[in-house]
């Protein structure tokens, strides 16, 4: 009996120290590993006492304590294990894990080890991106685009209708005057015979044309109503930064015998400076700087470009001065010229090789009041300016230069033509040389493409004879020049 007590005493001490050992053992391994996989032969020396009730304690391991929170007191007679608050929390956590596993169906997860505390839910709940949510903030780009498109369409309709109303208001106020001075008003050019339509011809949403003809000393008169691009939203926004005004341009083409040879222009300072640089006739025949018209009683805002002083004295009579003084704010430019060819023609290769075609023309440009905020009543205020156009046609027909003025005008035109020929002489020589080289190249290609050798030889001999004759002619000319020089 005494020997049995000595055998049981070491076993009891080992069992008391087992919880601490198992806690450290479980910490060294992952939770998913099964502790039962390890061999129990380490405790084979205690198999003889398997009938002892203490062995049952080994089969049912106590709760796993925290290593730092479970003090162990070794004593020869007894051992006590105290659980602190941390142990209770650990046991509560295990209970929560167990409750989570109980939610699953036992039949579906048959054979699954419920004691595995390392199981975690692998489902990942991702948040929906903000741009995929169904809210108005997700469509702000589409809303802006639709709003801009609607604004453009509304502005197009409103601007087009306003230009149409302004054009119709101008025509209604000027129709009686035009029909009393011209036999044909409003020919659209669609029919072979000239017919009076009595209405404006719309070129686009902001330009309207009116052709009039059938008057003494006048081939025809083209009136262009150049309104602002009110139908274009971008143009409307640009005009907020830089306001502009509508314009009415009148171009009268006279017969050759109904106008003398002179060039004259009057208008605002800015317009005269620009036209002198851009217009072909003003840059050639009016080389002097624009002069003030204070001598004739016109406002300082208007300047004059004239080929001769005699022309200015003849044009600026009392009635013409009255028109210019009363409507100086509406007059952009007035241009009379027998050499009118439009703006300068700039070619890529240089000066044009031919003088531009000229016509005797009267050109008027008027500004519509309002600076863009034009009303139909403002179009009625342009009627006196149309009376000035009719008066200018009759005035130019009656204006004739004296003998000295006529000779000076002819010398000016001869000088301009001579300067033009000098400027284009080198270009004409280069063009002639290029044509000769192209002709020779074409002749050589024709000879080389000839299949008959005999015919090819005859063509080469004929080409050589032509070249020889040309050389002989040049030599004869050189001899004649030397003889004349002697």
Swiss-Prot record:
Residues 433-475 have a biased composition (Basic and acidic residues). GO terms for biological process: endoplasmic reticulum calcium ion homeostasis; multi-pass transmembrane protein insertion into ER membrane; protein insertion into ER membrane. It is found in: Endoplasmic reticulum membrane; Rough endoplasmic reticulum membrane. Residues 160-486 are lumenal. Residues 24-138 are cytoplasmic. Keywords: Coiled coil, Endoplasmic reticulum, Membrane, Signal, Transmembrane, Transmembrane helix. It is a single-pass type I membrane protein. InterPro entries: CCDC47 (IPR012879). Residues 72-97 have a biased composition (Acidic residues). Residues 476-486 have a biased composition (Basic residues). The chain crosses the membrane at residues 139-159. It holds the Pfam family CCDC47. GO terms for cellular component: endoplasmic reticulum; endoplasmic reticulum membrane; multi-pass translocon complex; rough endoplasmic reticulum membrane. Residues 47-99, 422-486 are annotated as: Disordered. Residues 1-23 form the signal peptide. Residues 421-486 form a coiled coil. One of its GO terms (molecular function) is ribosome binding. Component of the multi-pass translocon (MPT) complex. Component of the multi-pass translocon (MPT) complex that mediates insertion of multi-pass membrane proteins into the lipid bilayer of membranes. The MPT complex takes over after the SEC61 complex: following membrane insertion of the first few transmembrane segments of proteins by the SEC61 complex, the MPT complex occludes the lateral gate of the SEC61 complex to promote insertion of subsequent transmembrane regions. Belongs to the CCDC47 family. This is PAT complex subunit CCDC47. The gene is ccdc47.
């Amino acid at each position: 009996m005494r020997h049995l007590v000595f055998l049981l005493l070491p076993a009891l001490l080992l069992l008391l120290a087992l919880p601490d050992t198992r806690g450290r053992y479980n910490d060294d391994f992952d939770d998913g590993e099964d502790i039962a996989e390890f061999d129990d032969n380490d405790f084979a020396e205690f198999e003889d006492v398997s009938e002892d009730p203490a062995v049952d304690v080994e089969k049912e391991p106590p709760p796993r304590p925290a290593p730092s929170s479970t003090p162990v007191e070794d004593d020869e007679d007894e051992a006590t294990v105290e659980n602190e608050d941390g142990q209770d929390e650990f046991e509560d956590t295990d209970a929560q894990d167990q409750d989570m596993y109980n939610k699953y169906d036992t039949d579906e997860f048959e054979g699954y080890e419920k004691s595995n505390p390392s199981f975690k839910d692998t489902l990942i709940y991702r948040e929906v991106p903000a741009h995929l949510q169904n809210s108005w903030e997700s469509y702000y780009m589409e809303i802006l685009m639709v709003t801009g498109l609607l604004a453009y369409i509304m502005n197009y309709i409103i601007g087009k209708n306003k230009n149409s109303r302004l054009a119709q208001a101008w025509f209604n106020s000027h129709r009686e005057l035009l029909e009393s001075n011209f036999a044909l008003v409003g020919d659209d050019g669609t029919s072979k015979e000239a017919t009076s339509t009595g209405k404006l011809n719309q070129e686009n949403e902001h330009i309207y044309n009116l052709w009039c003809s059938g008057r003494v000393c006048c081939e025809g008169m083209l009136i262009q109503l150049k309104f602002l691009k009110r139908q274009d939203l971008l143009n409307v926004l640009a005009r907020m930064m830089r306001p502009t005004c509508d314009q009415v341009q009148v171009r009268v083409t006279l017969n050759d015998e109904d106008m003398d040879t002179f060039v004259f222009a009057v208008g605002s300072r800015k317009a005269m400076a620009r036209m002198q640089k851009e217009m072909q006739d003003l840059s050639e025949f009016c080389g002097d700087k624009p002069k003030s018209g204070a001598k004739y009683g016109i406002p300082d805002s208007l300047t004059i470009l004239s080929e001769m002083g005699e022309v200015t004295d003849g044009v600026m009579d009392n009635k013409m001065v009255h028109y210019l003084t009363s409507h100086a704010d509406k007059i952009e430019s007035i241009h009379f010229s027998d050499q009118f060819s439009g703006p300068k023609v700039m070619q890529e290769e240089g000066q044009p090789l031919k003088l531009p075609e000229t016509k005797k023309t009267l050109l008027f440009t008027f500004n519509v009041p309002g600076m863009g905020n034009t009303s139909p009543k403002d179009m009625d205020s342009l009627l006196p300016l149309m009376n000035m156009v009719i008066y200018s046609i009759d005035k130019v027909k009656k204006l004739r230069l004296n003998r000295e003025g006529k000779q000076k005008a002819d010398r000016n035109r001869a000088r301009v033509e001579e300067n033009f020929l000098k400027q284009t002489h080198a270009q004409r020589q280069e063009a002639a040389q290029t044509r000769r080289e192209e002709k020779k190249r074409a002749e050589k290609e024709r000879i080389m493409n000839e299949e008959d050798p005999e015919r090819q030889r005859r063509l080469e001999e004929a080409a050589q004879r032509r070249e020889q004759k040309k050389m002989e002619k040049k030599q004869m000319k050189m001899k004649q020049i030397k003889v004349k020089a002697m």
